[in-house]
């Protein structure tokens, strides 16, 4: 019987890592998310056709994707409640990253459910960091502006 070696999965968040959600909100609502009433913001975005499908890349998003795409990353993206954003996010990924890229959509709090020991998550928010690490995953808290550091950090953890 052959020995099967499972490789760790590299997961990459979408909003704030590859996709510029904040810029999209600013273009649509004339203010950044932190300056808006969240209930009103989500109501407006839900009513905006193809909001997520039409979001721009983050400034370093294409360079980051270029650096990690050969590791076959899986997009692991949190979605707002109501099921209205999943198709848009999948459409963006198919168009910009390729139809062969696996995309998992879920509530942000459920992201750690996809973690196995050694799996890596690149995410701009640290709300699930402790839960990811508790499952023996590796967590890279990503922020724009230091791309070379993050690429080295990803490669070091693979």
Where are these regions (language model features)?
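Active-site neighborhood of HAD-like aspartate-dependent phosphohydrolases
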Residues: 1-49, 134
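Short hydrophobic segments within beta-strands
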Residues: 13, 76-78, 122
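Short, acidic loop-to-helix structural element flanking the phosphoryl-transfer center
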Residues: 46-75, 82-87
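Acidic, Mg2+-coordinating phosphoryl-transfer loop and its flanking beta/alpha structural elements
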Residues: 120-154
């Amino acid at each position: 019987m052959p020995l099967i070696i499972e490789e760790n999965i590299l997961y990459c968040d979408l909003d704030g890592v590859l996709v510029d959600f904040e810029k999209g909100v600013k273009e649509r609502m004339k203010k950044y998310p932190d300056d808006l009433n969240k209930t009103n913001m989500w109501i407006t975005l839900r009513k905006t056709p193809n909001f997520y499908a039409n979001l721009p890349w983050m400034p370093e998003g294409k360079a980051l994707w270029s650096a990690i795409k050969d590791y076959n990353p899986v997009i692991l993206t949190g979605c707002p409640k109501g099921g209205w954003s999943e198709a848009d996010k999948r459409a963006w990924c198919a168009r910009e990253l390729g139809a062969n890229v696996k995309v998992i959509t879920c509530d942000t709090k459920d992201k750690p459910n996809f973690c196995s020991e050694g799996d890596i998550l690149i995410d701009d928010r640290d709300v699930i960091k402790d839960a990811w690490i508790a499952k023996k995953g590796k967590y890279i808290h990503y922020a724009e502006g230091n791309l070379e550091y993050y690429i080295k950090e990803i490669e070091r953890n693979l």
